[in-house]
């Protein structure tokens, strides 16, 4: 209750690696630029091939948040979050996460039960309240979360799901 904040402490080597990955700007260029960037994609592929999931998961999740914000985000949301998502300064960046999985469906997101109900407006768009429990999160300590939830009166399966941007700290 109250102001409980969950946090994860990473080993200093994680941050040293993150600084090297982000600060040259090449890997994040894969989602910083709107057009495909073959060099960034090749570097991501090579680092994945050698087992670097510790940062590749956050890079991929953040790319998803950027894509969703560009496609559907209000100008206010884009102004608030895109600069932090697109910076190459490791200590100033915002990371993205994905909360999709629920216990009853596993990887079958069409079976999701978490609900979203409209609750006014904020930042130039509809504000939603999310009710339910997610089972797994990719990049759990991220700043911004893409979360699926079932919208009121939506159809069964994946067509009844909405995708919501949730700041970790409100």
Set out the residue ranges of the language-model regions:
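Extended, charge-enriched "interface" segments that sit outside catalytic cores
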Residues: 1-34
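Extended, domain-scale alpha-helical bundle/helix-rich regions
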Residues: 30-65
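A short core secondary-structure module
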Residues: 127-170
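Flexible loop/turn segments at secondary-structure boundaries
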Residues: 63-68, 104-108, 136-139, 154-156
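Buried hydrophobic positions in well-ordered alpha/beta secondary-structure cores of metabolic enzymes
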Residues: 65, 98, 116, 130-132, ...
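N-terminal glycine-rich flavin-associated loop
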Residues: 60-76
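Internal maturation/activation junctions in enzymes
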Residues: 73-119, 123-126
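Core alpha/beta catalytic barrel or barrel-like domain that forms the active/cofactor pocket
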Residues: 57-63, 92-102, 163
